[in-house]
Amino acid sequence: MPSEKIDIEQFLITNELLSENGYNHYEISNYSKFKMECKHNLNYWELSPYLSFGPSSHSYDLKKRWWNVRSLKKYIKYLDKESLPVEGYETLSMKDNFNEIIMNGLRLSNGIKLSDLENYNNFIDKNKIDKVIRKWDCLDIVNNNIRIKNNGFLFVDEITKDLFF
């Protein structure tokens, strides 16, 4: 396995090369030409509801997440009995939803829309947000979005932890 130092060097080289050739770094692990972003991936990052089909697939409806059985044989047996092949689910709390907005939003170059946080006033500590922005000089607020700038994607996990409630 390459060392963390090599990973960082390769990330920076890749970022520079793709940027110089007209690619936009629109989310933590993806680049695209202008207006050619992957809508499928953005659907997940932007926390839009989705239904998935097949063994081990996960679905999400803004309030809960559920997943199907892993085994293809079991999946087929459920369908043969005209039953849903759901193995489990989790109901998402307000805290879970807030943290998912933070976690997913920071992975997008556009960042987190401050308007998306309006329903979570109980979890928002403006002093904490200001402190995190000061701590990480790769974070800023542009057009009412908290976003990662420059090579801040290298630190997104640590930044996310600092903002979690």
Kindly give the residue locations of the regions a language model identified.
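Short, Lys/Arg-enriched, disordered terminal segments
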Residues: 20, 134, 164-165
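Generic structural signal of hydrophobic/aromatic residues within well-ordered alpha-helices
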Residues: 72-75, 102, 129, 133, ...
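C-terminal scaffold of the Radical SAM
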Residues: 1-121
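Short, amphipathic alpha-helical interaction segments positioned at domain boundaries
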Residues: 151-165
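Short amphipathic alpha-helical interaction segments
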Residues: 121-135
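A short, conserved structural fragment
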Residues: 134-144
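Minor-groove-contacting beta-hairpin "wing" of winged helix-turn-helix DNA-binding domains
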Residues: 145-149
